[in-house]
Amino acid sequence: MNSGRLLGKVSGARLFGLAAILLGQVLSQTGNSVAAAQTGDPEAKRGHGAPISIVEQGSFFVGGTEVTAPGKFDPTVRSASDAGQSFPIDHLYAQYQIPEHARRFPLVMIHGANATGSAWESTPDGREGYQTIFLRRGFAVYVVDFPRRGKAGFPSFNGTLGALLDKQVIPNHTNRKGDQTTFIGLRLGPEFLEYFPNTQFPKAGLDQFFKYLIPGVMDDENVIVDALAALLERIGPAILVSSSDSGRFACLAAIRSPNVKGIVDYEGANQPFPVGQAPAPLPAYDGFLVGPGAPVPLEDFLKLTKIPIQIVVGDNIPSSPQPIPQLENPRIRLIFKKQFVETVNRYGGDASLLLLPDVGIYGNTHVPFLDLNNLEVADLMSEFLNEKGLDEQDH
């Protein structure tokens, strides 16, 4: 269901929108002090704008499957048991807001590895995140949590992590990035707590930023893409806004679903190449081979040539090999990004790589949408959407 049909079915939408305005008038008087309280930084007062008229908002789960444990369910047993019980797993969680007079295509914001949709909601220092920025710009916005994390939950039952009686549904271990790895790997600075001199990272929100990242279980791209395709089937044509590892998932979702009308990708990784045309792995400083994204059949890859794609990359990516893997990976991944764009365009597509320093914007991290200049970065996305005819009003 697209945003236009959603607006049409809600008879009380105008009343709801009025309530949102009245509530917003109250909240706008306190929002600044709340943001400052979150971080202890008076500068966090900036960035909270006027009230927004929202005609519909909510959340739902979509996609996934169900597993049933062998045995017979016995309701008289007091202790928790999987026997004979069914469990929904591998669904996606989406929350959405639809503004008055929404544009034709909603934005679906997809988080990266070890993260959740909270990365789009607000910045670590309490400023408005992309969810609100683009809501203000007239887009319906859907923010998701992948299957197996966040509000979508993960497949675990009664007992050992991920085990349904004697069947291991997901591996019995998790992964998580620590503060030190996060600081260097997301390019806040070359060493822990040593910021790049020109950094745009909101330093007052560092503690909040570390808490954005959560433990993860195995990411299965088929499970994630299945869920994204189910979401797109439900909401209709949309624009995907991806980050980091979800750059690949956005591409695979576009291959799977004709409802993807464009992709804006913030430092995405592992984009696919056609079978037989993937670039060779590249050696890192220590000799470790870093490969490109797994290939897909050419007929699938060609579907990516039918939509506009923009990959946005921040600053402080080394130009020469580095002994620290967290700094090496962005250097090598940038090479693969360039090759992906070249390959799409060689087949007649419309892909572009936007290096922020090339347009005079410096100091951005791996997550430019959270940085101090995220409004400036958002302006570039708005320009791209306008140039590609993706910001038309819904009629």
Task: Go through each PLM region and give its residues.
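N-terminal cap/lid segment of alpha/beta-hydrolase-fold proteins
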Residues: 40-102
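Short, surface-exposed "cap/lid" segments of acyl-processing enzymes
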Residues: 101-166, 170-185, 321, 327
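Gly/Ala-rich beta-loop-alpha elbow adjacent to hydrolase catalytic centers
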Residues: 241-250
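A conserved short beta-strand
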Residues: 257-277
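Catalytic active-site module of serine/aspartate enzymes centered on a nucleophile-bearing elbow/loop
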Residues: 363, 367-395
